Amino acid sequence: MKIYLVGGAVRDALLGLPVKDRDWVVVGSTPQEMLDAGYQQVGRDFPVFLHPQTHEEYALARTERKSGSGYTGFTCYAAPDVTLEDDLKRRDLTINALAQDDNGEIIDPYNGLGDLQNRLLRHVSPAFGEDPLRVLRVARFAARYAHLGFRIADETLALMREMTHAGELEHLTPERVWKETESALTTRNPQVFFQVLRDCGALRVLFPEIDALFGVPAPAKWHPEIDTGIHTLMTLSMAAMLSPQVDVRFATLCHDLGKGLTPPELWPRHHGHGPAGVKLVEQLCQRLRVPNEIRDLARLVAEFHDLIHTFPMLNPKTIVKLFDSIDAWRKPQRVEQLALTSEADVRGRTGFESADYPQGRWLREAWEVAQSVPTKAVVEAGFKGVEIREELTRRRIAAVASWKEQRCPKPE
C-alpha cells in the first residue's frame, strides 16, 4: 500500500497559496484493508474513506469509464492493480494531476509542473470531453487564478467549444450549474468565469439572459465601452472589488438584463429597462434555483439602480418610499447592498473606474436619518393601529426633507 497527496493541495502549495483541504490516493490496497486499518468508508459509488484521526479523505486509486450521459454517467474501477498514473489520468487539468509522496517528491506524469510554470489550464486527456461539468470547472479555475496570470490552453478551449456545440451542457442539473457559479462569484475575478463561458459558447446555453446583452449598444456619452455585455462584466469586476458578498456580485451581474429586451430600433436608449429586467431576473433565478435571498436582492437592484443614480432629484417622499420598497426596515443591510451595486454600475465603465459616487453616501445618510425616527415617540403620542405607520412615515419624510435641505446638493 502506497499513499500520495494529490490534486488541489499539491497545486496550491506549489503556487504558494494556502492549502485548505487535503485529499489522498491509496495505491495497491482494497476496501477491506482500509477498514481493517480503522478507516471509515463514506463513498457509495467508489471507495472513499475517512482517516480515523484526521478525517481527511483517502480514495482508492481508480479509473473511470463513460457509461451514460452527463456528469454522473461513469463506471468506476478500483483495484490494487490501478496505478497512480491511471488515477491521475482521469483528472480534469494537468495542474490537478500532480501527486506528492511521503518523501515530498512530486510525481508529474502529465507535465502539470510545466503548465503550472507557464500558467496554463490544460486538460489531461480527451476523456475531459466526457464530463460537461468540467466546462464550468475550468471557467471557475480561470477566474480563481486570473490574478496569477493563468489562461486556458487553446486546445482545451477548443474542446470546451466542441462539448458545448454537441449539447453536452444540457445534461447539467440546475443545482450543479448554480453551485459552480456561486463558487466562481467568490473569486477575485468572477467576470472571467462568464467571459470564458462566452468564449466557448456556454453562456448562450446556461445564461441566455446575460449572453443577449453582448452587441446591445448604450449611449456613448454615458457608456464609453458602448457594449452592454462588456459593461456588465466590468460592473461585476468592480463589484468584486467593493464587496465579497455573493448576493451583491450576482445582483450586479443581473442589473441590466432588461436592456436585452429593448427593440433594436430604440437603441441605444433603454427607457424602463430596470423594471423590465425584473422578470428576466426571476426567470434566470427560477431556472437555476438560485436561493431566494440572492434572487430578491437581484430583483431590487434591477428595478431601482437607475433611481439611486438620480438621488439629488428625488423628493423626500420618494426616498422613504424606496426604503419601504426594499423592505429596509426589516432588512437594513439592503441599503448598503444597493449603494454598492449602484456604485459598481457607475464605476464599471471605461474611464470611470476611479470615479466618486456621492449618491451612495447620500443614500446611506438618508437611511440613517429615516431610521433614527423613533417609533416609540409615535406610539406615546397616542397614535393607534394604521395611524402609527402613517405618522411614522410622515415623520420620516420630514426628517429626510430637513436632511436633504442641509446636506444633499440641489439638482442642476
Curated annotation (Swiss-Prot):
Optimum pH is 9.4 for AMP incorporation, 10.0 for CMP incorporation, and 7.0 for the phosphatase and phosphodiesterase activities. Residues 228-329 form the HD domain. It catalyses: a tRNA precursor + 2 CTP + ATP = a tRNA with a 3' CCA end + 3 diphosphate; a tRNA with a 3' CCA end + 2 CTP + ATP = a tRNA with a 3' CCACCA end + 3 diphosphate. Its cofactor is Mg(2+); Ni(2+). SUPFAM superfamilies: Nucleotidyltransferase (SSF81301), Poly A polymerase C-terminal region-like (SSF81891). Its EC number is 2.7.7.72, 3.1.3.-, 3.1.4.-. ATP binds at G8, R11, R91, R137, R140. Keywords: ATP-binding, Hydrolase, Magnesium, Metal-binding, Multifunctional enzyme, Nickel, Nucleotide-binding, Nucleotidyltransferase, RNA repair, RNA-binding, Transferase, tRNA processing. Catalyzes the addition and repair of the essential 3'-terminal CCA sequence in tRNAs without using a nucleic acid template. Adds these three nucleotides in the order of C, C, and A to the tRNA nucleotide-73, using CTP and ATP as substrates and producing inorganic pyrophosphate. tRNA 3'-terminal CCA addition is required both for tRNA processing and repair. Also involved in tRNA surveillance by mediating tandem CCA addition to generate a CCACCA at the 3' terminus of unstable tRNAs. While stable tRNAs receive only 3'-terminal CCA, unstable tRNAs are marked with CCACCA and rapidly degraded. A single active site specifically recognizes both ATP and CTP and is responsible for their addition. HAMAP family: CCA_bact_type1, CCA_bact_type2. Belongs to the tRNA nucleotidyltransferase/poly(A) polymerase family. Bacterial CCA-adding enzyme type 1 subfamily. This is Multifunctional CCA protein. It comes from Escherichia coli (strain K12). The lineage of its organism: Bacteria, Pseudomonadati, Pseudomonadota, Gammaproteobacteria, Enterobacterales. The gene is cca.
